[in-house]
């Protein structure tokens, strides 16, 4: 029972998968928290308006939450696969989730970038749609404003920038995971050298003896 992908033996490959899965889980949780904080501090107050810019903000936030959930699921699946490499259905599941994560995270990053650009272009006027001021150019605390209008602009831009960074990191990690699955599934085209032997379709994790025998036979 042996598996070798490129220069990695089974033990090394399992460790790489485990680390990749953990990275995806952490990034997904942070992105989810950032999107939730953004919704709680700003979007829930302006989401009732019919402004096109506000609708774009809400759509991007929903996409961010969806992307974060898919990334977390992909990370957990990758961690499980690191323990159960013989499972072919699980390999395809992780590969599909990784590709979906990469596309969703990239789309989310583009949406966040658009939100930041629109906010700069409009000077954040859409963020103050729920408030009424005598002078829109000088927002001050008002009884009919559900939040602090003097901080909503900088807070929103900061949260969007954080989410953008993590979406890009998610996309790169998902691409890395998809690359690992591409080699494990031996899909074509594949230019890396590999030594692949049949693995028994057993749900049990590979033990240390199997790993050592694999490393020696494929070296």
Curated annotation (Swiss-Prot):
**What keywords are assigned to this protein?**
Membrane, Transmembrane, Transmembrane helix
Q: Which GO terms describe its cellular component?
A: membrane
The keyword Cell cycle is annotated on this UniProt entry: no
InterPro entries named in the record:
Beta-casein-like
How is this protein situated with respect to the membrane? Answer: Multi-pass membrane protein
Similarity comment text for this entry: Belongs to the TMEM54 family.
Q: What is this protein called?
A: Transmembrane protein 54
Top-down, what is the taxonomic lineage of the species of origin?
Eukaryota, Metazoa, Chordata, Craniata, Vertebrata
